[in-house]
Amino acid sequence: MKTEFYDFIKIDKNYKYKNGDFSAANGECLTAEERIEFLKAYSDFLEKKNGYEMPEKAVSDEETERLAAALKYKIAHKIRKRIRVDEMAAETYEKPENFSSWQFYHGVSEKNGELTFSDGVIPPVPCAKYEFECEKLTSFAFSFVLPEEYIDEEKKNGKVIPLTTDTGRIIELRRGVTEMLKLQIYRNGEIHARVGIPDPYHHRNFKLGDFKVDERNTVLIDLYEDFYEVKFNGTPAGRFEFTNKAMPDTLFISGGMHPVCKWSFKPESLTADGKTTTDFFKVAEPKEEGKQNLGRVELPFKIGGAKNKDKIIELSEKFVYDGGRAVLNIGSLDPCGKVYINEKFAFETDGFLKGEKDITKFLKTGENELKLLVYPRAPEINYSWHRNKDPYIAWLARDVYIDILPEGYIRDLVVKTVGISGNKVKAEISFKTVNFKKGLKTKIYLAKSPCGEEEVIFEGDAAESFETETEFGANLWTCENPALYTVRVELIENGNPVDDEICETGFRIIEQKNGDILLNGKKILLNGALWMQFLPPYENIVLSHICPTTKEIVWQAAMTKALNGNVARFHMLGYGNNDPRFAEVCDRLGLMNIWTTRLIDSAETIDVKNGWRAGKIYAEQMQEVINHPSIIMWEGSNEFHSSRAVLDKMYDEFVKTVKAADDTRLICPCSHLYYGGGLYGNKGFYYQDDGKFNQDFEPCESSFGWKDENVVRSSHNYEILLGYGNRWDIFREQAWKSQPALFKSKDHAYIISEFAIVGRQDNRTKEAEIYHKDDSYELADEKRAFGEAYEKLDFKLSQAYQALCAYNTVKYMRYLGADGLMWCSLSGGANDGSYIKPPIDFYGYKKQAFYALKEGFAETICFDKKAEVAYNGKYVCEPVLTGAEKGKTYNVKMEIKNQSGEVVCERGFAVKATAFTFDLEPFAVDLKNGYYSVEYLVEA
């Protein structure tokens, strides 16, 4: 093993300040001009070191193709007959509606000119759309009724101000997909105008008033050339800018991201071109379906985008049936759909949930036809802060197969690793026997995947609910050697196997002990990036965000590995993910992941009164992917501002639900709730690590969920890691008082599950010539960081600063004791391609920060523990070795080179590790004015 790491410093004998900060509030740092000069020198150094002349892909197209082909194998049953439906004939056609100009999505009904939206327990949330034509819209009036059940009493009583990320009922006027104006009804009892000026991704909220529950509330919007005015319940509520100036032609009514309760909406009047419409629901005239034949398509299959708006996907396939119980399995029809067998309606899916139905009664001997209808997704916007302009996110059909089953058969096979000793594994294997009867036997086989020779690891009596612990020899699953095995369970009747069930899995134990994360008993750091999954080309983002191709999944995994990452935190905004392909790819490539299920952010819906309504379904989603070794952690919510009562309930409900389904993995109920207590200006509630004090260190005892032994601590501490353009002195001081206990905790590991600094994209690529978007809202971070010097930045200096920050934040957090570091995010593409935090651009090209993170994420590295860049002649290096194995000997070489690459100081020695992170002997050296690289080489 050999690793390299680099510090970069400036020597100036006239530098007179105590700390060598790049920037600081008191001015004791590099001047604005010196910062630009520093970055020019640093950019030159990085280009030479990294061989950067033109942008280079993090993973080549050829390598992605090779990996995808190598991972494509399937494991198969030996007894059970499975009819796989990998391809289907596809057609699309416009979804018919009862009323002209309307589209109802997922549970909307009309009566007496009023729409009722019937929320369920999980998404999709009912929505409706009305399209109209006019030259000039001058006013629109509507009314709504929300029950008391909609109110979040804590938010209302606490007068909690809505955030950009808060969900709620939305009434929006658009021009096609372009937003003109938006009103949002929040659960704190208020209705607001949301204005996307100057930043369309972060709307400003303007309160219109408090709405009445269980009564009709009225809204009148008068539209003028440059602004609109709102009257709420008859009272003028304000004048506001349009987010975009154009003439609306679409009314969109959204229920928000999370279901809450039934509510109603009534369009009262619409005045356009001098005419007023009050009758909105005219019966639509029948029209021919006008099907478009797409030919044969592979599953999963999806369509999306405004060009396909409101189209139903119809998929059909013929298959031969020759008897037996036939059970149809559908991974997902998302957002919802229907199933027909031989032109007869069979069943409707429960939203996007897995469908499993006995279809025997619909079948005939010989040829049969399966037909699936997938209904279009509403043009909803569940993540405005990272949205793309086109809101028609794809609708899709996932994997489909038909099992032919005997009277008694196996289901719900689960394999858990419960103990390891060298190459000996103890596994708990369980399954259910449907229609169990006495005398049934079982035999369990193990084979190396994909096609190793089977060995019997258990045989004995079966049971209705079977569970056994068995010990056997096997290689452990690790990121470096992702050993996988096929476990096959046979059900035997009268000496003959009648059914079998299979799963591919790996054997490993993930746990936290003494505040560390251990994989197979070895301390590891969880280093990697978020997958937000806005993938190129631009017009395909609507498709890949929710349903990428398997090759695109492989591409993301390969890029994460190229970054020296060992973990992906799945963060597919608005929709999450429960597609087993992600886990399968990560299993086979050796990449751990943090899993959200399709119910991303669902833990936010947990409240004191109702608990977690979707908890049972979250647990069901867990069971679909339970055997994948790459999944090491379950996540419930992203960022959340909480009260004490809600926090206790959230953690208790999430921990209880998750552990009932799986007690072998780590748990993260919320990845960041540290608002207040010295981090960020927002007031929020949280406990100190020990659960005995609150954010202000006042005595306060937590409930059991906060203290659970599987729960990790997690933060998004951008503010003190140079994020948002913050200063170097804030970073160096790390003044958040709650954090030292997180670093030192012996009960819980502490991961920084989001951090990042911006770096502009290099547009000198063939892809960027076709499409790129430079006007990023994140450039405000650079303006804040550089002030008057901002205008002197170009993409090279921007990338140099991002790399400088990446080197220093990673090394400093590793030195202080972080157990994980995850950059936000892996690659660009969010915000219409203008999101510039990722170290890999939208098209997969490396920025300079890629190299910094790759080196910083290496297992064992050496660096100067000071996060400073300027010195006044004498440089004192305080080297640290981290990622070491106690008792192991490491050869360390340090070289200080000037700008010409000449070595001006060299040190080399062998050192025996005394801890995971430990100090080496400091040394001082007098240097001439100039810029120097401090290079560290570690060999073991």
Say what each PLM segment does:
Residues 124-149, 157-159, 315-317:
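A carbohydrate-recognition surface predominantly in extracellular/luminal proteins
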Residues 159-195:
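Glycan-recognition/cleft segments
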Residues 240-264:
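Flexible glycan-contacting loops in extracellular carbohydrate-active proteins
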Residues 551-558, 567-839:
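Substrate-binding/catalytic cleft of secreted carbohydrate-active enzymes
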Residues 215-229, 332-334:
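Localized edge beta-strand/strand-to-loop motifs within extracellular or lumenal beta-rich domains
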